[in-house]
């Protein structure tokens, strides 16, 4: 991989907002995936607590631990040469107090070499975001649908409380976050928030007017089985391709066709 590429920085995000240059974000959880995404021009790689659902197989993100995030984020940060790497702070690693959040965020940056952390919440998390940012740790916010609040919400659904969500996004920006994820909100609301804020908005299920977009890697490549959210555009069907390839291998082994002459030593 080339070593002379210019890495994406936090100031780049803010400049791209003013330049109206869209920001492409994808998730990754391991070295080879991050290396592929980085080489493909992704601006930012998010090591999301979504690893709980798409990697570990749980129904929610709530079981993910900070040690697990650190384990995955270290691999991703080591693979990335250009893309900004952001790691999620998982459930109950920051909600107790700003002090707890600072300790967790510090661990993540120090032990993974990623560039920033992401945490969920708006006005109620303003003091927490400020405490982390004041320690020179960049923070990406997350408002709208908050997966870590699934037990209270009851279901993953579009959030329509306009005033509340707009106030949350504004609070995140005023607390010093460098960007904010808008998840599962009406496109008109996302457009208003994007126009109102001086920091980039990164949409997931928030329409086309955000400053950037994020998707889960496994969803957009067709690896995840089962229900696909409305906001996901599937760019490949790797799940079926993997099944076909493995079935071919199993058949070749069973029939004695593998290994053949070209795969054998003399």
Label the predicted regions:
Residues 2-230, 236-266:
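Alpha/beta enzyme core
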């Amino acid at each position: 991989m080339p070593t002379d590429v210019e890495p994406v920085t936090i100031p780049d995000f803010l400049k791209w907002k003013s330049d109206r240059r869209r920001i492409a974000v994808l998730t990754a959880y391991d070295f080879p995936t991050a290396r592929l995404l980085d080489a493909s021009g992704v601006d930012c790689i998010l090591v999301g607590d979504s690893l709980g659902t798409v990697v570990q197989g749980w129904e929610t993100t709530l079981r993910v631990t900070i040690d697990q995030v650190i384990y995955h984020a270290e691999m991703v940060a080591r693979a990335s040469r250009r893309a900004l790497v952001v790691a999620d702070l998982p459930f109950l690693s920051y909600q107790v107090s700003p002090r707890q959040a600072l300790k967790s965020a510090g661990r993540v940056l120090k032990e993974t070499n990623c560039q920033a952390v992401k945490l969920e919440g708006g006005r109620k998390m303003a003091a927490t975001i400020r405490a982390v940012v004041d320690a020179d740790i960049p923070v990406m916010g997350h408002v709208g649908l908050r997966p870590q609040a699934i037990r209270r919400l009851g279901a993953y659904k579009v959030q329509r409380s306009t005033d509340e969500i707009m106030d949350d996004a504004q609070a995140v920006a005023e607390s010093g976050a460098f960007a904010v994820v808008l998840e599962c909100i009406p496109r008109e609301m996302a457009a208003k928030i994007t126009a109102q804020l001086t920091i980039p908005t990164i949409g997931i299920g928030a329409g086309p007017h955000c400053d950037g977009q994020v998707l889960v890697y496994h969803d957009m490549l067709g690896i995840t089985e089962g229900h696909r959210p409305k906001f996901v555009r599937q760019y490949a069907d790797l799940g079926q391709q993997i099944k076909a390839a493995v079935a071919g291998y199993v058949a070749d082994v069973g029939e004695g066709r593998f290994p053949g002459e070209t795969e054998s030593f003399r």
